[in-house]
């Protein structure tokens, strides 16, 4: 399962799956034109040569194509998943067989998860990474929290707020006991992080506002070719895939409550309506609520919708949007799942600790909870990402958009010197990512004349929209 060296070479579930993984990677490459075009553009140049990149992002077939793109561009890469259930074991095995250090398997414990995250931050010779590809911000969090502990070791004595925090602090305690300046040394060499998802971006902006951010960050999530494609069209396909693989439920005729109507919520609501469900949306934002209403969705509070829904989908990036009290009031056989990043959108820990409910595992990532009054609910993927825990995540083509942005962000951070702040990729690069994906869809762009370009005040080659344009 492992190979020992100065640092661990890999830890995956089953190396015999590598050939299967390689076959699927070959198929995915044909569906990821942005990444393949980036490889071709920089062939032989190795613009990431010398860069040590730590990746904390779902270890899927699509991510394997990203990893091998970064390696082809010259980087030294170590990888772990950012979710205990999202790894595709055949993908991890294929990457390990290719000689790339990877620490990921489906069904990690929280202790194992944070151990894996620690491994990607430990390169040969005791060095840390120069760059991070993050999804949810956990690798970035580990460095920042470790840095704080080195300043104030009493933080290690505080009582953990939950079981995940306990697992993280155990790893940080071990690091501190081995080297009390480890994270200061790591931070000193960091060139930056590119962050994939809404939750991680929120963390970055919060750290920047508190003047705690230790290195530059690029917000990949808010690139148009990420948020308006991965979050919207990706969720539109992968949500239903996860729910159906887990439960075989017929969605048509059911009432589906979608909590949140951002880009992920929009894609989720469209998916469920397309299957014939009646969709109720909950929202805190009046603009998003108005959008949902104008699309024909009922918009109501969770307290009102809780007794109507057959299926509940959280998409908010916030915590406690489905509480234990909500679950007590739900219809019998209600299905609950999350397609936001963390499991704290649903009060999973209070549910597991509640003496008035009996838990029965049906199959991996499907648990039935029966309450004292006899009604039962089904929780998918333990409240973590249903599309990756119960299925295989977004399709390759839409992930090519996101991962091309990630690659460009890594190139930006490595080849340029950024001051500490949170940045977005320039509009011109956003348009270039879209352009790379048009030919495969048979799209033919109209070309402006010089007079037309001058009339609307844009360059012939773009960008064609101002930074504030919302698409």
Curated annotation (Swiss-Prot):
Q: Which GO terms describe its molecular function?
A: adenosylhomocysteinase activity
- UniProt protein name: Adenosylhomocysteinase
Where is the protein localized? Cytoplasm
Q: What is its EC number?
A: 3.13.2.1
**Cofactor(s) of this protein:** NAD(+)
What reaction does this enzyme carry out catalytically? S-adenosyl-L-homocysteine + H2O = L-homocysteine + adenosine
Native species: Chlorobium phaeobacteroides (strain DSM 266 / SMG 266 / 2430)
- Principal place where this protein is found? cytoplasm
Taxonomic placement: Bacteria, Pseudomonadati, Chlorobiota, Chlorobiia, Chlorobiales
Q: What family does this chain come from, according to its entry? A: Belongs to the adenosylhomocysteinase family.
- GO CC: one term? cytosol
How is the co-factor bound, per the entry? Binds 1 NAD(+) per subunit.
Q: Name one Pfam family in it.
A: AdoHcyase_NAD
Which residues are listed for NAD(+) binding in this entry?
197-199, 231, 260-265, 283, 318, 339-341, 387
